[in-house]
Design a protein with these regions (language model features):
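Single conserved hydrophobic/aromatic residue that forms the stacking wall/gate
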Residues: 1-7, 11-12
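Short, solvent-exposed loop/turn segments at conserved positions within beta-propeller repeat blades
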Residues: 54-58, 122-125
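Beta-propeller blade repeat segments, especially FG-GAP/WD-type strand-to-loop junctions
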Residues: 57-75, 130-135
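Acidic, small-residue rich beta-repeat scaffolds with periodic aromatic anchors
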Residues: 100-225
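Beta-propeller fold detector
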Residues: 72-80, 141-146
Length: 225
């Protein structure tokens, strides 16, 4: 892993840093990156994520160092202009994610359970659960279930409801256990992944040696078990 990372971080750092480590011209509460091997193929992925705005929207770009040592941005199945899952923790620079692995067409598939909290309208917030997996170099989202929290009552008391993406109504317990039940039905194995997120501003404008240390700090903290 270390050998692969050395080549990968050189690619990310030296030849491609200006592609992803840039200042953005709009305000965001969070703008961070992390390194990981999401699909367990020995090639490092770079995730660059930002979150903020009145709708609390999140957007993430996924990059992969290919076998030729080039950094390429992966395609995704996300809908344009829609909020994407919140991959960063809102409080900590470190995050833990539940992962379910199974075999699809003879290949290992790693499904990361992720959540997205957003303001859908002035009186409605939603909290949805989905999974992300890299399938043939495409970041693929599987939408699972959603919680609606509405404040139409004159006393501003919340009305909460739950449903899956087929529109079937769920209880609170069914919603909270939906991802586990969905993947257990596929006989998937459960794992945990740990990520360390670092502010993009920390790596903008620094020397290559400093950038190497920062990248290594993120990857060294990454774990999967």
């Amino acid at each position: 892993i270390t050998t692969r990372l050395v080549g990968s971080e050189m690619c990310i750092r030296d030849r491609n840093r200006d592609k992803w480590a840039v200042d953005i011209d709009f305000a965001n509460e969070q703008y961070k990156f992390t390194l990981a091997d999401l699909d367990m193929d020995g090639q490092v992925e770079l995730l660059v994520s930002h979150c903020g705005g009145t709708g609390i929207f999140s957007y993430t770009s996924f990059y992969k160092v290919d076998k030729d040592g080039k950094l390429k941005e992966l395609d995704t199945t996300f809908s344009e202009y829609e909020s994407q899952p919140d991959l960063m923790d809102s409080v900590s620079d470190e995050s833990d994610v539940t992962v379910y692995s199974n075999i699809i067409n003879g290949k290992g598939c790693y499904n990361y359970i992720v959540y997205d909290f957003m303001k859908e309208s002035p009186d409605c917030y939603i909290y949805r659960v989905s999974s992300l997996a890299i399938v043939d170099d495409v970041v693929t989202e599987t939408k699972l279930a959603i919680e609606y929290e509405t404040y139409e009552d004159p006393d501003y008391e919340a009305t909460i409801s739950y449903e899956d993406y087929n529109g079937t109504e769920l209880t609170e317990d069914e919603y909270r256990t939906y991802a586990a039940r969905y993947y257990e039905a596929q006989q998937a194995s459960e794992h945990r992944a740990h990520f360390k997120w670092i502010d993009v501003s920390d790596i903008v404008g620094v020397s290559d040696s400093e950038a190497a240390q920062i990248l290594m700090e993120s990857y060294d903290a990454y774990s999967f078990h």
